[in-house]
């Protein structure tokens, strides 16, 4: 939506249906726009009708050559508020947008209910002489100027993602527009307005803010009648990103009318897990002595939720009083319901991680690390959902199966921990696809690995239990990166090893002939089963399997190809060829794998380990650029001598057809897979109850 000003269109957006309006105002300088609020909008829009705008000069607003003075910017703001706001509103102003907020608060006190100043300021100045020290540098070195600026805005360790985002957003304007915007606001000072601000005001500011010094904030707050100051020890200017959880909650509480006193927030490295739980923690009513578990399960692939359901059932067998609520997005929530288990109502509020990963996917290709790297706003939104759940109700245990959001934000905010916490994963270490230390992916992997190592070093009591779903030897024997620990040695120090977990017992399956009859396969036919998990990335592999099968079908007349698309791959082509069957989601796929004469799969851990345990011959195609499938899973399968690895790009339908013929029904001689991992994982978790 746009407001049309005499010289520019100003973009605004409304999110949420709350009864109260909340306006998030980015800074005046055009180095950012409304995207800077990506960690705030999804959460706050559950409570408010959230309004944002892109200031002239960046984002989806126009970029006129002039009009960047304070008065014109103020007129832009008023025009948007007049167009869309429902007074009285709560106004959140970041950085140099604060002078606009002060002007509006003084001119229209009846239209504001609350004012929040995030790293706010009342005056602005730029280095002089302007042309030499500012304009020329921006024109001649725009890229490096942006990088230097945002390194100052995010001085905290492990801030690379925030720096990268802001450098990108600043690059969406032009050097000339940026120069003009800086020139136009140089020398502004609205200190004389502060004493006339009558709206309840809250300031959030970091002591290490290198853009607006903390002393500036103290003077500003002292001049505003009744204003309160929340101090972030060692916090920088970019609190909206680095302290998103706390910023979100302070904004929520204050805008809803709660009083927030002057508060000092400890630096991240100094924060601690509360022990014992504070009296203010929510207390649940007695429920026949039930012990309640909140289980956050990654929906990226179905392996996580399948093993989690199996472990949960085994946990209840050992502890009948345990009740488990699952927080798991699509398609994992469908599996939970199919098993007849409890899906927490807040699941509907989760942002869809699977859809995000599919957005990074191409034909049999998934840049898994890049998808994880770019999932930060989803992680924030989903952690805020979980934080609200445990704020309202008490659980006796939290479990996160590759719940990267829960794990990251608990280490950043350990004081929010209210129950024992167990972390599960089936791999350790993020890996770049090529060992080029200058590449962006290598640097990002190092950053995230270093952050994870630092988290566990600084806050060893956040996790009460870390389980690797596998064995010590499954961890790669290599460093996380330069100057970082060896992965396997680090895992020995921080993890317990459950062995691989299965959601079924291969030993309990019927004899093969009976199983085939039960599943509708004739005893005299040869069954090739191709399955691609729970996402749409596998369409290309299914298509290639169908093409290969048509080439060899005449050589094996008593044969059938079954293509399993998964719950998110439903629009499969109808006519693949003779003796080709297409199926949607198959809940007990493992039974079909056990009955098959050959399986063809991607390189996902769950499916390949099931096939190894079932001793079914299989061909596997790791997704291109998927570090976990290409390296971590391949390590396990190599150790077992299981499966035949093929490369999707270099395997033609003819070559795949030849492999089908060679391995169809071929005896398997891989090492045996231990089958007690589910029991071991359940026993380890039970120790926390």
Residue map of PLM features:
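Conserved HGGG/HGGXW glycine-rich cap/lid loop of the alpha/beta-hydrolase fold
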Residues: 6-60
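Active-site loop/oxyanion-hole signature of alpha/beta-hydrolase fold enzymes
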Residues: 36-38, 42, 52-92, 249
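Flexible "cap/lid" loop of the alpha/beta hydrolase fold
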Residues: 99-107, 112-141, 620
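Conserved alpha/beta-hydrolase catalytic His-Asp/Glu region
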Residues: 125-128, 140-195
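Short beta-strand/loop motif that positions the catalytic acidic residue
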Residues: 197, 203-205, 209
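Conserved nucleotide-sugar phosphate-binding/catalytic loop shared by glycosyltransferases and other
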Residues: 318, 322-373
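A nucleotide-sugar donor-handling region in carbohydrate enzymes
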Residues: 432-435, 440-536, 566-568
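Donor-nucleotide binding loops and adjacent catalytic segments primarily
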Residues: 499-598, 649
């Amino acid at each position: 939506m746009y407001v049309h000003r005499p010289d520019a269109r100003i973009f605004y957006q409304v999110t949420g249906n709350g009864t109260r309006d909340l306006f998030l105002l980015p800074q005046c300088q055009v180095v950012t726009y409304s995207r800077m609020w990506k960690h705030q909008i999804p959460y706050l829009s559950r409570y408010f009708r959230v309004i944002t705008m892109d200031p002239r000069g960046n984002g989806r607003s126009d970029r006129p050559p002039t009009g960047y003075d304070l008065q014109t910017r103020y007129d832009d703001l008023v025009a948007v508020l007049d167009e869309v706001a429902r007074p009285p509103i709560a106004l959140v102003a970041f950085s140099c947008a604060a002078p606009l907020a002060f002007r509006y608060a003084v001119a229209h006190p009846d239209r504001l209910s609350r004012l929040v100043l995030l790293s706010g300021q009342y005056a602005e100045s730029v280095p002089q002489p302007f042309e030499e020290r500012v304009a020329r540098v921006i024109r001649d070195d725009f890229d490096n100027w942006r990088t230097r600026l945002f390194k100052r805005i995010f001085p905290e360790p492990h801030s690379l993602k925030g720096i990268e985002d802001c450098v990108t957003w600043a690059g969406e304007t032009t050097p000339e527009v940026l120069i003009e915007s800086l020139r136009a606001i140089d020398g502004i000072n609205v200190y004389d307005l502060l004493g006339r601000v009558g709206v309840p005001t809250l300031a959030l500011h970091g002591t290490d803010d290198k853009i607006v010094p903390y002393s500036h904030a103290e003077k500003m707050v002292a001049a505003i009648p009744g204003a309160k100051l929340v101090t972030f020890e060692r916090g920088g200017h970019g609190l909206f990103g680095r302290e998103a959880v706390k910023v979100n909650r302070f904004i929520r509480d204050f805008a809803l009318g709660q009083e927030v006193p002057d508060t000092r927030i400890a630096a991240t490295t100094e924060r601690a897990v509360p022990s014992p739980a504070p009296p203010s923690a929510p207390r649940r009513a007695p429920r026949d002595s039930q012990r309640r578990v909140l289980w956050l399960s990654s929906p990226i692939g179905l392996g996580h939720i399948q093993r989690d359901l199996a472990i949960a059932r085994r946990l209840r067998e050992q502890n009948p009083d345990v009740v488990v609520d699952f927080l798991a997005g699509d398609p994992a929530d469908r599996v939970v319901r199919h098993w007849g288990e409890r899906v927490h109502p807040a699941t509907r509020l989760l942002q869809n991680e699977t859809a995000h990963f599919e957005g990074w996917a191409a034909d049999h290709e998934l840049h898994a690390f890049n998808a994880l790297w770019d999932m930060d706003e989803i992680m924030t939104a989903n952690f805020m959902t979980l934080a609200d759940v445990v704020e309202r109700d008490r659980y006796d245990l939290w479990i996160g199966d590759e719940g990267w959001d829960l794990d990251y934000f608990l280490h950043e905010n350990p004081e929010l921990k209210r129950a024992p916490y167990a972390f599960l994963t089936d791999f350790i270490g993020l890996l770049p696809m090529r060992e080029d230390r200058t590449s962006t992916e290598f640097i990002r992997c190092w950053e995230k690995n270093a952050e994870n190592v630092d988290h566990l070093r600084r806050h060893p009591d956040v996790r009460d239990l870390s389980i690797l779903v596998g064995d010590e030897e499954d961890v790669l024997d290599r460093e996380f990166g330069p100057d970082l620990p060896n992965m396997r040695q680090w895992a020995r120090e921080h993890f317990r090893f459950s062995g691989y977990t299965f959601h079924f017992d291969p030993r309990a399956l019927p004899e093969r002939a009976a199983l085939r009859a039960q599943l509708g396969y004739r005893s005299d036919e040869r069954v090739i089963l191709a399955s691609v998990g729970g996402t749409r990335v596998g369409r290309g592999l299914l298509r290639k399997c169908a093409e290969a099968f048509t080439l060899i079908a005449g050589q094996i007349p008593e044969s059938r190809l079954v293509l399993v698309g998964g719950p998110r791959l439903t629009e499969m082509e109808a006519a693949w060829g003779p003796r080709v069957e297409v199926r949607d989601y198959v809940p007990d796929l493992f039974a079909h794998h056990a009955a098959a004469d050959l399986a063809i799969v991607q390189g996902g851990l769950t499916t390949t380990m099931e096939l190894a345990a079932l001793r079914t011959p299989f061909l596997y195609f790791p997704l291109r650029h998927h570090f976990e499938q290409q390296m971590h899973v391949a390590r396990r399968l190599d150790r077992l001598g299981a499966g035949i690895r093929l490369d999707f790009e270099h395997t033609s339908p003819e070559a795949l057809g030849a492999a089908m013929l060679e391995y169809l029904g071929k005896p398997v001689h891989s090492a045996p897979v231990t089958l007690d991992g589910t029991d071991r994982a359940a026993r380890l978790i039970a120790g926390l109850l």
